[in-house]
């Protein structure tokens, strides 16, 4: 009977949550469960493309599509609402649009920027966090060029961009900027030699997930296109002028018209309010992706701190891991609905590619280093495959990179 259907509630339509739902609707009949997906926006956005929209090399509309295009309305109830409280013991979720009970819960609420308490960073630096922040940043950068061109008293600092962080997001954003800056200079008649791009990183090495050879390739590629790197240089504050850094124990002011922070993300702030043992918005999972004490609550994606059985540290938060967790969670939910035991999650690392603009990149694919146009092509394949897995061939054809 319909009233006896178990209530499966999925929070978040990012890579992890949407992958869970799309697999569930493929594998379950309409009367197998009452599936509800709650997301604060009516759209899903490709968060791995945010660096492109932030630089302005793609339009912000290119990276989003309606969630309704991916869900089967006969099997999934999609609700646009913001989650305000998760009561794990009462098995109830509160939103700004109403209250939802659950028998099985999937928490996939995504990430927000983490500034690690650096003074002034939230107030004075742009964050690459979502569609709105990316749109705001790209418009700001173009406005700086337009205003510089129109100004009689020109200040070259208006054309300077500081990027905090030399991890994935920071390097990919810089790569896009090296594509975008020549376009802006041509559009507004600006001398490109006046533009200054500076990347500041506290760690002694950028892109720590890659070999020294790949890092050297990426550094040379970006330096040849005007990027200056300040490695092993911690940012201690951010103000209206730019970053304050520490060099040899002394503080120095780096000035720029645009400051961008890319060096940290954390899981949703709701995690600390809803669960115990949460650090930076992430909770340690059991091997089947549920959490301690709750065999019917799965936490996946950016809110998950999954530690494989033979390892000591949690897996990083990547789209590849999130989608694999989503698929596995859907399979485990099906098992629970059938009265079966869940199975442990096994992550398959197929590789990682970091783009350097549209036509270059570095990466590791099944343990093998790749660089150049081959890496750039593979990045486009990965991006398009993600859309295909979530929305099917039609959406991949419309929104993919080919």
UniProtKB/Swiss-Prot annotation:
Transmembrane segments: none annotated. Binds 1 FAD per subunit. It is found in: Cell membrane. The keyword Oxidoreductase applies. SUPFAM superfamilies: FAD/NAD(P)-binding domain. The keyword Cell membrane applies. Gene3D superfamilies: 3.50.50.100. It catalyses: a quinone + NADH + H(+) = a quinol + NAD(+). Its EC number is 1.6.5.9. Its cofactor is FAD. The active site is at residue 172. FAD binds at residues 12-16, 39-40, 83, 302, 319-320, 379. One of its GO terms (cellular component) is plasma membrane. InterPro entries: FAD/NAD-bd_sf, FAD/NAD-binding_dom, NADH-Q_oxidoreductase. GO terms for molecular function: NAD(P)H dehydrogenase (quinone) activity; NADH:ubiquinone reductase (non-electrogenic) activity. Keywords: Cell membrane, FAD, Flavoprotein, Membrane, NAD, Oxidoreductase. GO terms for biological process: aerobic electron transport chain. Signal peptide: none annotated. It is an enzyme of class 1 (oxidoreductase). It comes from the Bacteria. Alternative, nonproton pumping NADH:quinone oxidoreductase that delivers electrons to the respiratory chain by oxidation of NADH and reduction of quinones, and contributes to the regeneration of NAD(+). Belongs to the NADH dehydrogenase family. This is Type II NADH:quinone oxidoreductase. It comes from Staphylococcus epidermidis (strain ATCC 12228 / FDA PCI 1200).
